[in-house]
Amino acid sequence: IRSVYIFIMRSVIVITTINKLNQNIINYDLKSKKVNWKFVVIGDKKTPKNFALKYGDYYSFQDQKKLNFKFSKICPPNSYARKNIGYLISFLENDIIIETDDDNYPKKNFFLGRTNIHKTKKIENKSWINTNISDIFRISHRH
């Protein structure tokens, strides 16, 4: 008898915003719900007080201070670094964290299944290498 294991990858989308609720955020909120993904939005001091999501989890500036992370208490206001609070929240319950911005509109295939299995190249050279950040699959060797 052979055992078969099925792993369900839990996904979450994390964004930060200082803006009012816009169509992009509404789309992420609705479509995340449809595909059973979590949606986490991290607000800031400038985020409107009446900001609310229908399905996702919104953390206001004040909500973040109540979290059990030291970073959430020391992270400066009005900083993109606050997105890290969303990552900390998401690491607890999710396998895949998808990062995007509130001004990006999700393309049609954005919500298709994701995998953590990727084709890679084996590095034979034992010398120092540099991975090019603009193309993570291209590797250049340094001699």
What does each model-identified segment do?
Residues K66-K70, K107-H143:
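Conserved catalytic core of nucleotide-sugar-dependent glycosyltransferases
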Residues V40, D57-Y59, I98, F137, ...:
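Hydrophobic/aromatic beta-strand patches that form the interior of the parallel beta-sheet core
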Residues R10-S11, K31-V41, D57, D95:
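Short loop->beta transition adjacent to catalytic acidic/histidine clusters or analogous donor-positioning motifs
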Residues K49-L92, F111:
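Active-site-proximal specificity loops/subdomain of glycosyltransferases
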Residues S3-V35:
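N-proximal low-complexity "stem/linker" segments adjacent to membrane-targeting elements
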Residues D44, F61-Q64, T100-D103:
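Short loop/turn segments at strand-loop or loop-helix junctions that form parts
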Residues N94-K107:
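Short beta-strand-to-loop acidic/aromatic patch adjacent to the donor-nucleotide binding site
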Residues I18-K20, I42-P48, Q64:
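Short, polar loop motifs at secondary-structure junctions
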